[in-house]
Design a protein with these regions (language model features):
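Active-site palm subdomain of RNA-directed nucleic acid polymerases
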Residues: 42-56
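Nucleic-acid 5′ end/cap handling module spanning
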Residues: 32, 55, 68-70
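Ordered, soluble secondary-structure elements with a strong preference for glycine-centered loop motifs
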Residues: 31-35, 74-78
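Short, conserved phosphate-binding/catalytic loop or strand-edge motifs used
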Residues: 56-66
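A conserved hydrophobic secondary-structure block that centers on an alpha-helix together
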Residues: 32-36, 44-47
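C-terminal accessory nucleic-acid interaction domains of nucleic acid-metabolism proteins
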Residues: 1-19, 25-26, 47, 75-212
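Catalytic palm subdomain of template-directed nucleic-acid polymerases
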Residues: 65-77
Length: 212
């Protein structure tokens, strides 16, 4: 059974406990490019005065979790997530992209900044309903380039957890978000909304071309 909790506590749904970057490889891409993109996100976070922890998604990518202060609103967290994603993209635009429409990604690693608001994300240690039953598992930053998602399954996780659960120790303390960083993110279009409008525009253009 998979477990996908929300990012906020019950009764405080407008105040998320984390902001999250979901990093996925291009179709058929190796995990090594995900690692490189995750390190871009870490660099962008450091530049913004923030810190995060990373875990495999249990699929092909990773999730970077950034604990945020209790007073943070969903809108503020979403804005900062967009800002960090765009900053990471700018560090290596040949590797990473924030393009929500798959055909626009050009074989690059996708930095998904839409895990905000009422979104859910698979929990650390949750198994996934996939061949081999992989598990979403925390990895120290310094070891990320030495693992693959296939290293963490329902068969290997119990042994890896024998010395204790590492996720809580890897997560930094909750952090306040800079007002300047929030404003930076507010100026960036929401990816899902932008993609929806662009999809409609392209559909209209195709209909026009077909009719001409």
């Amino acid at each position: 059974m998979e477990y996908h909790p929300t990012l906020a506590l019950a009764g405080h749904m407008d105040h998320p406990t984390y902001l999250i970057l979901d990093i996925d490889p291009p179709e058929g891409g190796p995990f090594s490019v995900v690692v490189r993109a995750a390190l871009l996100v870490r660099e962008a976070l450091t530049g913004a005065g923030l810190a995060g922890a990373v875990k495999t998604s249990g699929a092909k990518g990773v999730h970077v979790f950034v604990p945020v202060a209790a007073q943070t609103t969903s809108e503020e967290a979403a804005a900062v997530t967009r800002a960090i994603a765009v900053r990471a993209e700018r560090l290596d635009p040949a590797l990473a992209t924030t393009a929500f429409i798959k055909e626009d990604r050009e074989g690059k690693v996708f930095l998904d900044s839409t895990r905000a608001g009422g979104a859910t994300v698979v929990a650390a240690y949750s198994p996934r309903a996939r061949p081999g039953v992989p598990v979403s598992f925390p990895v120290p930053w310094g070891e990320l380039d030495r693992v693959t998602p296939a290293d963490f399954t329902v068969h290997t996780a119990p042994r890896l957890l024998a010395g204790g659960a590492p996720w809580a120790g890897q997560l930094p303390a909750p952090q306040p978000l800079s007002p300047d960083l929030v404003e930076e993110g507010r100026a960036i279009p929401i990816a899902r909304v932008q993609a929806m409008h662009e999809g409609k525009r392209r559909a209209r253009a195709r209909r026009t071309d077909t009719g001409s």
